[in-house]
A protein has these predicted regions:
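Charged, gly/pro-rich active-site loop segments
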Residues: 73-134
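Hydrophobic/aromatic beta-strand elements that line small-molecule binding cavities or substrate pockets
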Residues: 29-32, 76-78
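A short mixed-secondary-structure module that forms the rim of ligand-binding clefts
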Residues: 32-68
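Short glycine/serine/proline-enriched coil/turn segments at secondary-structure junctions
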Residues: 23, 68-70, 122
């Protein structure tokens, strides 16, 4: 597992920042998986966050790990992917999502990763650790 993935797991909840025209929007997320060294996330196709990312794919994910008082900034460009293996992995790790994303509800899970990305772990003393991304 990558340091990025481990940090997101330790934090539990992370925050995804998008833009709605000139208005920043931030919301908590928790769904993520790693496959082949890349981190993948998911949102619903029926949500504003999805429409915002389609319109402006530049986003930032921030996670805070309270035990160490460090935080992660993961910034990049959203790229939506169609990956049955990643989708199945998400459903295995978060089975409750099957109740939301299925033929009966009509809702679709949109899986994305970040490209042209940077990731840093920072602390209150000003230390910055640049993470290597795949």
């Amino acid at each position: 597992m990558s340091k990025l993935h481990d940090f997101l797991n330790e934090a539990g909840i992370f925050y995804l920042a998008t833009a709605d025209d000139d208005q920043p929007k931030v919301r908590p997320l928790g769904a993520h998986v790693e496959e082949d060294g890349k981190e993948y996330f998911t949102v619903g196709d029926f949500k504003e966050v999805y429409r915002q990312m389609v319109k402006n794919p530049r986003v930032e994910i921030v996670a805070f790990e309270p035990k160490t008082r460090r935080w992660l900034r993961y910034t990049g460009k959203v790229v939506f992917v169609d990956s049955p293996s990643v989708e199945e992995k998400i459903f295995q790790e978060l089975p409750h999502l099957r109740q939301m994303y299925n033929d009966e509800t009509g809702y679709k899970m949109k899986i994305f990763t970040l490209e042209d990305a940077t990731a840093k772990i920072l602390d209150m003393q000003g230390n910055v650790e640049e993470l290597e991304l795949k």
